[in-house]
Amino acid sequence: MSTNNTQDDAAEEEDDDLQYFVRIGTTDLDGTKAVERSLTDMKGIGKRTARIITDVASVDRHATFGLLEEDEIDSITDAVENLDDHIPGWMTNRREDFFSGDTDHKTGADLEEKRRHDVNRMKMIDSYKGVRHKRGQKVRGQRTKSTGRTEGTIGVNVEAIKEEAAEAAEEEE
């Protein structure tokens, strides 16, 4: 019975130390998941990139994110912010930026902003992809004849027919 109590006490202490949300950059990450898994919730970071980040930060990737010490979280934050220094150029998501020519790895809101800026630039210069974006059509050569139809189907609405028949029957009476 006493071993059960010590296990319960240890579990309660872990719950007290657990941070349910860990903030990295502008993103709140789940503190109840493993470090590697939680990092993949951030835009611009996948499984492979998360593994590299944990290796660079010297943190156990299977550890619960919310139970890490402040210095470990700071090392992960530094690894995310300086990720382009630790990965090869072909692995970054901003290779040879159009304006600056730099190779960089963007994450979170910065990545969304850059993508939106790129799409707007394509629309402004009326490139083929920009025109497709303007029209709301598929951009990467997918078929459009039969797939991707967002409009509702033009079929028979049985309920509407029944309602019209009921209204017509009431009018006749």
UniProtKB/Swiss-Prot annotation:
It comes from the Archaea. GO terms for cellular component: cytosol; small ribosomal subunit. Residues 130-155 are annotated as: Disordered. Keywords: Ribonucleoprotein, Ribosomal protein, RNA-binding, rRNA-binding. InterPro entries: Rbsml_uS13_C, Ribosomal_uS13, Ribosomal_uS13-like_H2TH, Ribosomal_uS13_archaeal, Ribosomal_uS13_CS. The keyword Plastid does not apply. Pfam families: Ribosomal_S13. One of its GO terms (molecular function) is structural constituent of ribosome. GO terms for biological process: translation. Gene3D superfamilies: 1.10.8.50, 30s ribosomal protein s13, domain 2. Residues 130-143 have a biased composition (Basic residues). Belongs to the universal ribosomal protein uS13 family. Located at the top of the head of the 30S subunit, it contacts several helices of the 16S rRNA. In the 70S ribosome it contacts the 23S rRNA (bridge B1a) and protein L5 of the 50S subunit (bridge B1b), connecting the 2 subunits; these bridges are implicated in subunit movement. Part of the 30S ribosomal subunit. Forms a loose heterodimer with protein S19. Forms two bridges to the 50S subunit in the 70S ribosome. This is Small ribosomal subunit protein uS13. It comes from Haloquadratum walsbyi (strain DSM 16790 / HBSQ001).
